[in-house]
């Protein structure tokens, strides 16, 4: 009975580890991307930073418990964890940088346009004054 029960969890965890991260990383990547976009528009960064570690801790806890049952597939999860951390770190950072830079650029561009318009007006006024006198 030990061999049957021992072989089932190994195959189950292998199927789990192979099927779960692919589907989870895709859905999580989309969720974190959409959440970070929504939250960056609102301006609340604390929610995105608190949610990404929470969603990050859940799969590691689930994988570590399954890893304790069998040590042989324990060599495959660490690279997958690294990939998850890289994806989770990159996905929130990119949208926040883009969204943060856009309003600043817009403000800077608006300010530059205003100063250019003012400079043109001043030059026109100066030209008309010199011509009239």
UniProtKB/Swiss-Prot annotation:
GO molecular function terms noted in the UniProt entry: DNA binding; zinc ion binding
GO cellular component: nucleolus; nucleosome
Residues binding Zn(2+): 12, 16, 24, 26
Ranges where the record places region Disordered: 1-104, 114-133
Single Gene Ontology BP annotation: spermatogenesis
Tissue specificity comment: Testis.
Positions with biased composition (Low complexity): 34-52, 61-72
Cellular localisation: Nucleus; Nucleus, Nucleolus; Chromosome
Function: Plays a key role in the replacement of histones to protamine in the elongating spermatids of mammals. In condensing spermatids, loaded onto the nucleosomes, where it promotes the recruitment and processing of protamines, which are responsible for histone eviction.
Family, per entry: Belongs to the nuclear transition protein 2 family.
Protein name, UniProt field: Nuclear transition protein 2
Organism whose genome encodes this protein: Pan troglodytes (Chimpanzee)
């Amino acid at each position: 009975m030990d061999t049957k029960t021992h072989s089932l969890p190994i195959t189950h965890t292998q199927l789990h580890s192979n099927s779960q991260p692919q589907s989870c990383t895709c859905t999580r990547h989309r969720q974190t991307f959409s959440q970070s976009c929504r939250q960056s528009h609102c301006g609340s960064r604390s929610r995105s930073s608190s949610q990404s570690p929470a969603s990050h801790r859940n799969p590691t806890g689930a994988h570590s418990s399954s890893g304790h049952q069998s040590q042989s597939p324990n060599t495959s999860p660490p690279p997958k964890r690294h990939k998850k951390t890289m994806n989770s770190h990159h996905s929130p950072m990119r949208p926040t940088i883009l969204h943060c830079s856009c309003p600043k650029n817009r403000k800077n561009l608006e300010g530059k346009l205003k100063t250019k318009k003012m400079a043109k007006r001043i030059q026109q006024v100066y030209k008309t004054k010199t011509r009239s006198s």
